[in-house]
Amino acid sequence: DSEFAELKIRGKIFKLPILKASIGEDVIDISRVSAEADCFTYDPGFMSTASCQSTITYIDGDKGILRHRGYDIKDLAEKSDFLEVAYLLIYGELPSGEQYNNFTKQVAHHSLVNERLHYLFQTFCSSSHPMAIMLAAVGSLSAFYPDLLNFKEADYELTAIRMIAKIPTIAAMSYKYSIGQPFIYPDNPLDFTENFLHMMFATPCTKYTVNPIIKNALNKIFILHADHEQNASTSTVRIAGSSGANPFACISTGIASLWGPAHGGANEAVINMLKEIGSSEYIPKYIAKAKDKNDPFRLMGFGHRVYKNYDPRAAVLKETCKEVLKALGQLDNNPLLQIAIELEAIALKDEYFIERKLYPNVDFYSGIIYKAMGIPSQMFTVLFAIARTVGWMAQWKEMHEDPEQKISRPR
């Protein structure tokens, strides 16, 4: 039997359908409120509002659970590779061996970008932030694929593959241009993560040998950042896509949203905070500053809009961080890691943080791993964009396949 919630306005009762979720909280359907009750609902930041139906990602913030298509994030990080997870998000099931091989071949085939795109890079000054370059380059792909300006359902799969394939190439080109080095072409026999590291760190005169520990760590980071429900950048992609905008334009809007320091730029802020603290002996001082409502200092890397428990991605990254630093001989002498571990231990025992359910999030350890890999801080958000493109494309595809999809129009 159908269930309803009752809303009483000016003495009149309105019955609102309660929609049953396959997992998690049920939802009150308020879509007819404005038409029937002559008023709107008000929810700044969409704190209590579901904007769409989705079967891609599930989060239980109170229990610290994150699942993609029913698979726990910790299992995917430990047992899968990034393109396998990409296939899962886009198609809804893990691939068979044959499906995986075909998918990876298609991604490799589409990793090159049009040579004319090189001229676009030359219009930027050498000090340009790689995210600025990447945002423009991804948007410009619309000019190279005019057939997708009026895309059809048959284009969804190829579009997703093209985007996943070209984003790491553009990301590496953005980095190379920012440091004045020649672009490095993809090397298709390498897997997805190896190929990106090759394009980042090889030069025409120097071959880059990929450290397997670093490759595996980056693979995990990409998996952990692949999708996360209707966050700011994903919602931006969906809103842009709801107008029928071409997919390259939609992804560029996601990149713009991700660039914000409250979203994709948070791990860089964690590194800056750890450097500011400087030594473990100063941690109590900064804990006190974080508690002082009159002090502008914020403890970066703690707390999350959704999680009121330990972010499951942070738990994986903490161990990954130790593995990488141990392999690189930095485990016992990396000052940032030592400060981070002690800061976490102190904060998790402090009543102020316990009462407010402030736990380490995915940004707390990822920046330390990137720094150990030799990836500069201005590239942190770029790497986030590489991973999240998979989620953006899965969400974009799901939105266009939804028969109830409408153009987004907040009131």
From Swiss-Prot:
UniProt GO cellular component terms: cytoplasm
Domain of life: Bacteria
Record-linked Gene3D superfamilies: 2.20.28.60, Citrate Synthase, domain 1 (1.10.580.10), Cytochrome P450-Terp, domain 2 (1.10.230.10)
NCBIfam families from the UniProt entry: cit_synth_I, PRK05614.1
Gene field: gltA
Note: Citrate synthase is found in nearly all cells capable of oxidative metabolism.
Name under which the protein is recorded: Citrate synthase
Family (UniProt): Belongs to the citrate synthase family.
